[in-house]
C-alpha cells in the first residue's frame, strides 16, 4: 500500500511539472503568433490524452482508502505515543528526585569524608550532574582528613555507638541546703565543719546523709501523740488532780491552715484551756463549732417556739370547750387539762371533737370512728362525732413509764392544737334526706352519661343504691330490668354495664 501511494504521488508530480513546463513555453510562443498558440493548445490536449488513463483513475480510486487508513493509524498511535512519552518523563523525574535526596543525605563513614565517599559511590548518571560539585569540594577534603584521623573510630564489627566528649568546664559540687540556712555553711546545725569537696570519701557522705535525714533533722521537734484524759479538763479538776500543762504547748509554735485538722490550732484546746499561749489559730481561718453531747443539754437549751412554729390557719375558729365528765379520755389519770381539747365549727357539722392518736409507749391501739345519724326528718340538725378511743393498758405501768406517757400525751396535745387534722368533706343536699345504702329510689330527672362508668336513667325508673360518695354521686343498679340482677364480681370488667353504673344523687328520690 505504501509503494502504491508513493507511485501515485510520483506520477501526479510528474504530470504537474510537465503541464507547467508546457504552459510556460506556450505562453512565450503565443506572443509571437496567435496561430501557433492554437497548435500548442492542441498539442497539450493531445499530450494529456496520450497519458495512460487507466493509471490516473486507478490512483485516484485508491486514494480514499489510503487516507482513511492513515487517519485510523494516527488516531490510535498518537494517544499511545503521548501516554508513553509522559510516563517516561515521570520516571525520569522520580529518578532524579530520589538521587537528589540521597545526595543531600549520603551515608556517613568513620574514615572517609562525607562528600568524598558520596562522589565515589554515586553512579555515572549522578556524577554527570554532580561532578563539578565534587571537584570543588576535593580541595577541602585534605583539610578535613586530619580531623578524621584524630577521631579515628573502630570500624567493622567492633565498632561502638558510644560518643565521648572532652569537656574542660569544671564540675560544680552538689550540696543540700535547709530553707533557713545559707549556702556558705549548709551543715552548721550539726556542729561539725563538713566540707563540700566532691572528693570526700563515701563513708563520710553516708554519715552526713544519715545525720541529716534521720539522726538530727533541722527544725523538727518530737511531739507526743497522747490526748488528755477526762480528769484533766478544767471543769472536772480538783485540788489533788492538778497536773502540769502538756509539753506540746511549750515546744510547738508553728501555725498553718492545716493545724486545726491535726488538733494543733483548733478551738477544741482553747475551750478547755489546754493551749493558751502557743496554740494560735490564724485570724483568717474559719472557727470550728463547739461540740456538745445531747445527753448534757439542759432543758432550757432549745426554745420550744422556735422548733415548732404555729401553723394554724387564721380562717379557722378555736374555741376551747370542756370535756364531759364521762369522757373516756379522762381515764388516763387526769393528766390532760380540759383546755387542751380543741373543737371546730362548720356549717354542716355542729361539733367535731378532735383528739390526737392514742400513743402508749411501745404499743399502738386500734382507732375507731363513730358516726351518729339522727332521723332523716331532722337532717338539718344532724350531728357527727368523731372520737378516737384510747384503751387502757392491760398490765399496770411503772411510775417512770406513766410519767413518760403523760409527757408524751402533753406533747401530742400541743401538736393537736398547733397542727389540727383536716376535716372530712360532707356532701350537701337541698333539704333532702341523705341517700341510704340498699334502698330503692325513683328517678325524678333524666340523665345522659358523659363518662364511661356512667349510665342513662329516665324519669320514673327504679334504682337500687349500691354505694355512695361524699361528692353526691352514687353507684346504682336498675330494678326494672328484664334480664334480672346479674351477680358479677366487683373486680370483673363486666361489673359496670348498661344497668349498673354511676349517676348523680340529685336525680334520685326515695321510693315510697
UniProtKB/Swiss-Prot annotation:
InterPro entries: Fus1_SH3, SH3-like_dom_sf, SH3_domain. Residues 436-512 form the SH3 domain. O-glycosylated. Keywords: Glycoprotein, Membrane, Phosphoprotein, SH3 domain, Transmembrane, Transmembrane helix. The keyword Glycoprotein applies. SMART domains: SH3. It is a single-pass membrane protein. The modification Phosphothreonine is found at residues 178, 281, 424. The chain crosses the membrane at residues 72-96. Required for cell fusion. Negatively regulates Sho1p signaling to ensure efficient cell fusion. It is found in: Membrane. Pfam families: SH3_1. This is Nuclear fusion protein FUS1. Induction: FUS1 remains essentially unexpressed in vegetative cells, but is strongly induced by incubation of haploid cells with the appropriate mating pheromone. The gene is FUS1. GO terms for cellular component: cell cortex; endoplasmic reticulum; mating projection tip; plasma membrane. Residues 97-512 are annotated as: Hydrophilic.
Amino acid at each position: 500500500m505504501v509503494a502504491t501511494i508513493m507511485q501515485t504521488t510520483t506520477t501526479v508530480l510528474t504530470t504537474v511539472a510537465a503541464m507547467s513546463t508546457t504552459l510556460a513555453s506556450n505562453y512565450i510562443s503565443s506572443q509571437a503568433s496567435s496561430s501557433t498558440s492554437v497548435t500548442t493548445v492542441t498539442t497539450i490536449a493531445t499530450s494529456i490524452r496520450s497519458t495512460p488513463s487507466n493509471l490516473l483513475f486507478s490512483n485516484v480510486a485508491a486514494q480514499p482508502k489510503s487516507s482513511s487508513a492513515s487517519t485510523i493509524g494516527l488516531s490510535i498511535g498518537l494517544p499511545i505515543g503521548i501516554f508513553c512519552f509522559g510516563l517516561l518523563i515521570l520516571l525520569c523525574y522520580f529518578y532524579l528526585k530520589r538521587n537528589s535526596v540521597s545526595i543531600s543525605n549520603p551515608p556517613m563513614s568513620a574514615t572517609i569524608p562525607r562528600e568524598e565517599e558520596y562522589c565515589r559511590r554515586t553512579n555515572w548518571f549522578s556524577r554527570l550532574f554532580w561532578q563539578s560539585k565534587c571537584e570543588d569540594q576535593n580541595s577541602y577534603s585534605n583539610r578535613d582528613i586530619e580531623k578524621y584521623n584524630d577521631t579515628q573510630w573502630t570500624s567493622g564489627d567492633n565498632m561502638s555507638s558510644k560518643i565521648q566528649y572532652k569537656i574542660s568546664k569544671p564540675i560544680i559540687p552538689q550540696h543540700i541546703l535547709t530553707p533557713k540556712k545559707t549556702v556558705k555553711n549548709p551543715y552548721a546545725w550539726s556542729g561539725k565543719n563538713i566540707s563540700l569537696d566532691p572528693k570526700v570519701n563515701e563513708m563520710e557522705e553516708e554519715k552526713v546523709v544519715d545525720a541529716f535525714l534521720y539522726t538530727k533533722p533541722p527544725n523538727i521537734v518530737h511531739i507526743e501523740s497522747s490526748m488528755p484524759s477526762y480528769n484533766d479538763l478544767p471543769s472536772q479538776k480538783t485540788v489533788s488532780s492538778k497536773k502540769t500543762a502538756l509539753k506540746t504547748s511549750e515546744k510547738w509554735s508553728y501555725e498553718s491552715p492545716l493545724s486545726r485538722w491535726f488538733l494543733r490550732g483548733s478551738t477544741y484546746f482553747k475551750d478547755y484551756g489546754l493551749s493558751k499561749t502557743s496554740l494560735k489559730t490564724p485570724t483568717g481561718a474559719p472557727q470550728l463549732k463547739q461540740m456538745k453531747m445531747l445527753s448534757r443539754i439542759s432543758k432550757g437549751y432549745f426554745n420550744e417556739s422556735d422548733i415548732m412554729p404555729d401553723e394554724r390557719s387564721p380562717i379557722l375558729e378555736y374555741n376551747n370547750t370542756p370535756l364531759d365528765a364521762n369522757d373516756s379520755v379522762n381515764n388516763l389519770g387526769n393528766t390532760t387539762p380540759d383546755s387542751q381539747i380543741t373543737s371546730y365549727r362548720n356549717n354542716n357539722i355542729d361539733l367535731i371533737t378532735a383528739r390526737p392518736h392514742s400513743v402508749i409507749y411501745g404499743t399502738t391501739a386500734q382507732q375507731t370512728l363513730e358516726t351518729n345519724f339522727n332521723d332523716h326528718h331532722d337532717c338539718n340538725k344532724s350531728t357527727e362525732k368523731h372520737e378516737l378511743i384510747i384503751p387502757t393498758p392491760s398490765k399496770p405501768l411503772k411510775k417512770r413509764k406513766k410519767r413518760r406517757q403523760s409527757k408524751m400525751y402533753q406533747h401530742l396535745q400541743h401538736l393537736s392544737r398547733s397542727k389540727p387534722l383536716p376535716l372530712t368533706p360532707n356532701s350537701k343536699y337541698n333539704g333532702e334526706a341523705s341517700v341510704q345504702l340498699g334502698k330503692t329510689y325513683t328517678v325524678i330527672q333524666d340523665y345522659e352519661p358523659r363518662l364511661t362508668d356512667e349510665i342513662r336513667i329516665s324519669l320514673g325508673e327504679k334504682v337500687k343504691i349500691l354505694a355512695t360518695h361524699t361528692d353526691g354521686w352514687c353507684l346504682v343498679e336498675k330494678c326494672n330490668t328484664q334480664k334480672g340482677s346479674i351477680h358479677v364480681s366487683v373486680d370483673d370488667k363486666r361489673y359496670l354495664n348498661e344497668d349498673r353504673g354511676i349517676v348523680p344523687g340529685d336525680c334520685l328520690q326515695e321510693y315510697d
